[in-house]
Amino acid sequence: FFKQKTAYDIRLSLVGSEMCIRDRLYDGIVSSRDVGKQQELPPTLANTVIHGDSRNLEIPDNCVHLVVTSPPYNASKAYDEDLSLSEYLEMLYNVFAECYRVLAPGGRMVVNVANLGRKPYIPLSSHINLMMNQLGFLMRGEIIWDKSASAGSSCAWGSFQSASNPCLRDVHEYLLVFSKGNYKLLREKSEREEGRIDTIPRDDFIQHTKSIWSFATERASRVNHPAPFPVELPKRCIEMYSFAGDVVLDPFNGSGTTCVAAKNTGRAYIGVDLSEEYCAIARKRLEETESWICLLY
């Protein structure tokens, strides 16, 4: 009996220590902050594609509910400048600072990013996580986009079937998810009655709250863009992290995939891009996109 009791006491002590350590991990980490009050989006900005620089968004503070974006990878794509890593990260910082400014309290931001290179390997996702923390964002989690269904059979550069220098084949990207000010996106009863409702089906919610998503990539030729993501990606983010009638922003709009998904799901959209050519492509795609009835705009 004495030995059993001692072992039991030890187990209790270990459990208590683990809980104490786990609690201390969160010391100093903010879970909410005052970021002001939500503002109304000017109606003239709703459902627009803007040719402009997202480092200086002409959008009022605290009026966007969700940002979904995939920054250009700075990987010799025709639309991208040839920036050093520090210059690229500075550019992202300035754009994301503007996104933080325009997001409403409780608003969310989803950044789709792939890590780059092999020799050396550049962990862009890690850089962005640190950057977002510095800007004041609250991190909600990470989703892995499994692209293996679209992967070819060729090997990555490196030694074949040898320990000399095997290289990993990248078949995934990250979706980094953040909130501004609070983890909860507020909604008044009157707003729900006026149509600011959830649109995600039950089965989709159960599947999409898992941290791994699997679906194929988009063909670049289909949307006239060198690095497109499929509509399914922003659609899932929009339905999970916003209500019908909410405002969705993409500061790296490209060919307009996020805006297309927003229009399909009954949200208002704003797309901003430096390229006049891609703005024209996005507008054309949106003209050809069916609109889900949006009750608030």
Put a short name on every predicted segment.
Residues 1-21:
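Single conserved hydrophobic/aromatic residue that forms the stacking wall/gate
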Residues 17, 22-281, 287-288, 294-297:
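Core catalytic lobe of class I
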